[in-house]
């Protein structure tokens, strides 16, 4: 009897279709080619008009490669990124973004703009790219298409010490901008609460301190009333994910008490992806089911099993392949000259 042919192996990086889609949108195929140029002090900071030097280089490449995105649109995104960076840096002595942080924020601007402007057309464009990737890998990738309902999550795979906290704070501002703009056209669009899910009580306190430093109103969730107000104008509720349960008890709260149209930001989002603690993944998914989620982790790759033959593992890998918008994992961090214990503070020179 002939041996059954095994499916060709696909690397985890091959699954990152969303990340490659946006690299292509600005005229490149890999982050390293941008880093070789932009990982330099001469590109950090702003020009005389208040725009980043990163913006000028990316606009030049996009124009040279005949990308559909215009210089004016890139400048518009750049101006918002600069404004948000200035706002969260006022109490920090100013912030100067690194190139990988800037690209993360640029891709987020591009995604949210398309997501809120014309979700159907955006979904079609993403699926055309998936079709081309499936063909390029001769069917080995076998990525299922996006659906409109599956587009409400972005994930950032960024190395420890690379400044994920600052990304989170600017992501909040980015989302609120596009949400408010969309509400002018469709008044029924709404977010119930903005929630930061932290892995433990100590990290909740750290998030509160960091959000306060960035000038963003926040409170640590209190079951008896604190942090339960609706709407982003009431500030952000920081919740230790261990306090979420199916049914609330003395020190916990039922996940369903928050409704499902929330903006949820998940720290250390790799937690909850294993079969032993998958309940946390279920809880946070329900919180953002009719809203939106931003997830952050240095170790998505380690938490996801790209070589598994189990259906549930392959589905999870595909889900995050279509959600990870930035891969600045440790290999890039190390390659850019940052050591294992390095931490970026983004201090303005």
Segments predicted by a language model, with ranges:
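Conserved pre-motif I regulatory segment
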Residues: 59-157
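Flexible phosphate/Mg2+-sensing switch loops adjacent to catalytic phosphate-binding sites
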Residues: 115-149, 177-193, 221-223, 305-326
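Walker A (P-loop) phosphate-binding loop of P-loop NTPases
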Residues: 161
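Conserved Walker A/P-loop ATP-binding site and its immediately adjacent core
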Residues: 166-170, 182-215
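Inter-Walker segment of RecA-like/P-loop motor cores
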Residues: 212-249
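Short loop/turn elements that form and flank the Walker-type P-loop nucleotide-binding site
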Residues: 111, 150, 190-191, 232, ...
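Extended, charged/polar low-complexity intrinsically disordered regions
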Residues: 1-93
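Signature of the SF2 helicase/ATPase Hel1-core->accessory helical subdomain module
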Residues: 128-132, 167-180, 209, 238-349
